Amino acid sequence: MSLDTVVEDVRDEARARAEDIREAAESEADEIVAEAEADAERIREERLAEVDRQIDQEREQTLSSAKLEAKQERLGARRDVLEDVYDDVEAAIEGLDGDRRRELTETLLDATLAEFDDDEDVAVYTHTEDVDLVEELVEDRNAVVDGEIDCLGGVVAESDTSRVRVNNTFDSILESVWDDELKNISERLFDQ
């Protein structure tokens, strides 16, 4: 065998080895590229899913906020209507006159004085415009009109001996009835 043949064999062997290395490197590079592409696709899908979740979450938050705001608006409007109704009732009570006012005041005075012992001296307070009426109603009773109070009508009475104070004003009756009946009033007004 000649030197040329040996050199040629070594070259062929080197070429074959280089080809094997190149093929192995290409195969490994293809695997790396395929893995990178798969990772990139997985990351892209994860990001898209996260964006979709964020969009859904923001949509739900926006919807919830809008529903809450609408509910608050409805409640505010209902509160305003109820306040208007209360004001109208107050105005109607304040506008009572004549026999109806006398009848209601006398009923409240009777209920108030019933809370005291018969021998107690009772001081009665009433609305400015009702002083004359109440003075007339307390005649021949153990009570005297002792002043005026800021109210729609009715009476407040107290006794020094028993330290009892009874508030039977139109205001207190209205407030009590309003509190007790607010749910029914609301249901009737808003058909719930």
UniProtKB/Swiss-Prot annotation:
Single GO term (MF): ATP binding
Biological processes per GO annotation: proton motive force-driven plasma membrane ATP synthesis
Disulfide-bond pairs as recorded: none
Lineage: superkingdom: Archaea
Subcellular location: Cell membrane
One annotated Gene Ontology cellular component of this protein: plasma membrane
Stored SUPFAM superfamilies: V-type ATPase subunit E-like
Keywords: ATP synthesis, Cell membrane, Hydrogen ion transport, Ion transport, Membrane, Transport
Topological category with respect to the lipid bilayer: Peripheral membrane protein
Role this protein plays: Component of the A-type ATP synthase that produces ATP from ADP in the presence of a proton gradient across the membrane.
Similarity annotation: Belongs to the V-ATPase E subunit family.
Subunit structure: Has multiple subunits with at least A(3), B(3), C, D, E, F, H, I and proteolipid K(x).
HAMAP family, sorted: ATP_synth_E_arch
Record-given protein name: A-type ATP synthase subunit E
